[in-house]
Amino acid sequence: KNTTSISLDPDIFYPLIKKLKENNDYVVVNVDWGIPNERNVTTRQKEYAHALANAGADVIIGHNTVIQKVENYKRTPIFYSLGNTTSDNFLSKNQKGMIVQQDWKGSHNQFHITPIQSKDGKISKDNMNKMDHIRFKNNIKDKSIDLKSDQNGGYTFEY
């Protein structure tokens, strides 16, 4: 029996999320998944994310070693991977990540995304040049979200 985490077996997580929804206003699911160093979201990740959302998860936050897409599925934000914020792996793409912050404003909810980098064991805001911003946005933008640049060098979207 797995005692450190819960399997992504739908027979396990679906009833668990349903039960959590009965007693909680908001359910955030954090998942470690995907192929290391791969920016593309796998079919399996997408299937599991949609199943988690259908089970009632309000937000899904995934982890992989690199940044992956952000999707809005049936008003459930899915951050497939926030990237890597703890390792000084020699691959530069593994030293990039993002912090997400949610703001509730009546019926409109908004997420703020701040690009970060890890260098010499320290995490800081990633002060990107124009090309880096284009790459970052292309790495995370999915057709299901209207991603907008903000005045702080990050991004926002409503759902």
Give names to the regions the model predicted.
Residues K1-Y159:
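Acidic, metal/ion-coordinating pockets
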